[in-house]
Amino acid sequence: MTDYEAARRLGHEGVRLRPATLQDAEAVTRVFLDSRAAAMPYLARVHSDEDTLAWITHVVLPTSTGVWVAEERECGDLLGFAVLAGDDELDHLYLRPDALRRGIGSRLLAEVRGAAKGGLSLYVFQRNAAARAFYERHGFTAVAFDDGGRNEENEPDVLYRWSP
């Protein structure tokens, strides 16, 4: 086993996945905001931190089909989250910037795939090359490109689909 494989295995043992609760709202909001700022500094901020917290508290957590969080096993710090909307839409998958490349995103994606009723679809901003590469590595295919008119940020995006 290489050092990289050993580090990934250790990372898996030190991280647990669980369903999100309303008590996770502030931590989920922080991950959402920090991840977007780090990965997509070009992205327009269309909502305040307070409005984002209210949206996660009153819309995302209580109305989504499933929301899972990844947390440090020892201290409980939230590292990332994923959201399934409806039967087949991966609505969000975000990780803290310091939690990347540890297999956590892959584990969250596996949870969502397991809960979906078949395949999955998702939108990714076209300029988010790291996210696009992640989903393509996991078997998603780009099926449509949009000019950004469908999202609040007016940022061109890509519709991806995955079938089991």
Placement of each model-derived feature along the sequence:
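A short beta-loop-alpha structural element at the N-terminal edge
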Residues: R16-R30
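A short helix-loop-beta-strand connector motif used in the catalytic cores of GNAT acetyltransferases and
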Residues: T57-V69, E89
